[in-house]
């Protein structure tokens, strides 16, 4: 399935500044695997050593937080859009 991934500004250093990239995948995990194959080091920026999403990273599939779906096993449909959103804290 071909889908669009919206890359946040802090991670664009991996994509040579590209704001969006197209990937082929059937799950969110495959999206991250494919991004890491094309852009080495990408996965380590969004996942911890165990392969889980880092606490401060949110991934949305067509506006739905994948943590409330099937997490990284969430299936993706052709034409879907994934947005990777790093949390911002302040105080």
Each predicted region: which residue ranges?
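Ubiquitin-like/PB1-type beta-grasp interaction modules and other compact soluble beta-rich domains
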Residues: 1-90
